[in-house]
Amino acid sequence: MLPPSGFAGLVPPSHFQARPLPTLPRMAPTWASDVPLVQSPASQDVLERRLDAQRSTVTTWGQDFCGDGQGLGRRGRSLELGFSSALSQQAELISRQLQELRRLEEEVRSLRETSLQQKMRLETQAVELDALAVAEKAGQAEAEGLRTALAGAEMVRKNLEEAKHKELEEIQSLHQEQLSSLTQAHQKALDSLASKAEGLEKSLNSLETKRAGEAKQLAMAQKEADMLRNQLSKTQEELEAQVTLVESLRKYVGEQVLPEFPSQEWELERKELLDTLKHLKEDRADLQATVELLQVRVQSLTHMLALQEEELTRKIQPLDPLEPEFPKKCRSLLRNWREKVFALMVQLKAQDLQHRDSTSQLRIQVAELQEQVTSQSQEQAILQRALQDKTAQVEVERMSTKSLQMELDQAQEARRRQEQQIASAEEQLKFVVGAMNSTQAKLQSTMTRMDQAVARIPSLSNRLSYAVRKVHTIKGLMARKVALAQLRVESSPPSEAAPPLDTDLSVELEQLREERNRLDAELQLSAHLIQQEVGRAREQGEVERRRLIEVAQQLEQELQRAQESLASVGQQLEAARRGQQESTEEAASLRQELTQQQEIYGQALQEKVAEVETRLREQLSDTKRRLNEARREQAKAVVSLRQIQHKATQEKERNQELRRLQDEARKEEGQRLTRRVQELERDKNLMLQRLLAVLPSGVNKKCSPRSVESSSSESPAAASCKESVKGSLTVLLDNLQGLSEAISRDEDICVEDNQNTKKTKNPPSDPLLS
């Protein structure tokens, strides 16, 4: 029987009830950044020492329990308390490790987010560096474009100067040729007026010279057309280049200049030149036809005159020796009349030809002067447009210099921003590298701790299994002790004061059994749960370890990439700095060149403007002088035309007077001849009457046959003489009538020709006369 004093230090059953384990909050700890993530090795050593001490106490408790039976309840309770405290500590350790694993997961997520942000920043920096490189390339391209534009402007200026010099030389040569041709034409006209007898030959020579001049003019026109075509092609190319340049630079100038179409003007000029060539060819063909007709008429007239002279010389013979002056007078009168008529006809034809030549020359001169005026006005307009283009180019260059200055300022500001961004990026990269190194060190430390915890899990499981076995042995010993106590109680004699004690003991024993069963069930359940939690924690730890290894590898790769990108960014930064220095140097040199070019170009432009103004003034004065000369020549031509018309009217009046005089002379000569014949017949009759009266009648009788014979002989002689005189007179009259008819026909033809020429010349001659 157990002594009652042995149960005096028993613990109530409520003390052995299951206590809930302390649960830590799942929220993120506030001491994550201040307290170290994992417990220090000193705390781990303390925990291990506590576990060893508990293990030693458990073993000593078992030994004492085996050796001593009185302190069984106390030792069992202390053992259970120690075991429950060890389990609670292990559960706390496991929960702390789980919390640390969760905190590590959160840190890994935050590191991933920071790495993604750093990647984005690096990508933005790379994009900005690419944009800077593109901007630098664009600046270099613009600088090269400005250089090429300056070179092109210089080439255009040189080409324009050469073309203007060539045009001036060509215009001077053309003016000299025109002046020489005009002087030659005037000299020829004066020579033709001075020498009327050689008018036809000189007109033919003048026509030949005109033909040669027209051929020369045609050749010159063809050359000019070729030159104009070449110039057209060159100017079209230059204009296309200028149009492209103007269109590309309109946004700087702000002016919307309508594109010019000089090709249409050149086409119109070419068409006008072709029309003038056609008209000249037609005029030349007409002149050739008129010359041929005139030659035919002259030949026919000379032939007719030769025939008439032969007939007159053959028919008119001196029959009357008493009157030898009559045929001479007739011949002289006829010759003078022929010469005068021929001279008048030649003069009229020469005047008509001169009038035609002068009018055609005046028309040609007026057309040439008009063409010169139009060409000079076109040149003036072209030069004004060129000046406007040059001023626009100067303004564009000024705007481009301003834009380049602004771009340089922007590039410098961008460079400063890039330097600041690069410095901030370097600092961020340094911070990221430090954070990565710290996270890598923390990950390595956590991995080592996880490995240590995983390595300690088998030893802890062995300890748990050993503790379970010890509990079973203790339970068996306890049951044996209880059974021995019951046997002792049963074998001991009952006493009077013992029943209440037995009832208390039995109640306490029942409670102890229940408590034992409950604790046994709890121990088994807790051991099973601990094993499950340990397995789950082991699996989670393995998975987390693998994931952390992968994350660490990824972070290492990202770190390497970041370092490589940092190196490339540094290289690009160095290249960008070098390119920026080169661009700044090139910009400075370009500024100097641009200022020099602007000064040179401004001086050259001012000189060119002054030269163009002086040349235009000279050309305007020359054109005014030529216009005045042309007007004076036109007035002279009008005066000469009026004089020629007056002379023609006077010549017509003279011709009419001569015809009237010739008719009167012819009538008087016929009357005189008839009177002479009548007087001769009367004298003859008187002589015959006197002879008949003087001679005696005998003699008359004797001599009657003789007289009859003589009269018969004289009568045929007189008759023959009369017949010859009458025949000569009739022939002369017939010749005179034929000549007068021929002259009248020629005059009618000349009058018709004059009327036709006047009709054809009156419409264009009105502006000249006005």
From Swiss-Prot:
It is found in: Cytoplasm; Nucleus. Residues 648-672 have a biased composition (Basic and acidic residues). Residues 701-721 have a biased composition (Low complexity). The keyword Transcription does not apply. Residues 56-289, 334-420, 476-669 form a coiled coil. The keyword Transmembrane does not apply. Its main location: cytoplasm. Residues 573-592, 641-672, 700-721, 744-770 are annotated as: Disordered. GO terms for biological process: cell differentiation; protein export from nucleus. It comes from the Eukaryota. Keywords: Coiled coil, Cytoplasm, Developmental protein, Differentiation, Nucleus. One of its GO terms (cellular component) is nucleus. May be a regulator of keratinocyte proliferation or differentiation. PANTHER family: COILED-COIL ALPHA-HELICAL ROD PROTEIN 1 (PTHR46822:SF1). This is Coiled-coil alpha-helical rod protein 1. It comes from Mus musculus (Mouse). The lineage of its organism: Eukaryota, Metazoa, Chordata, Craniata, Vertebrata.
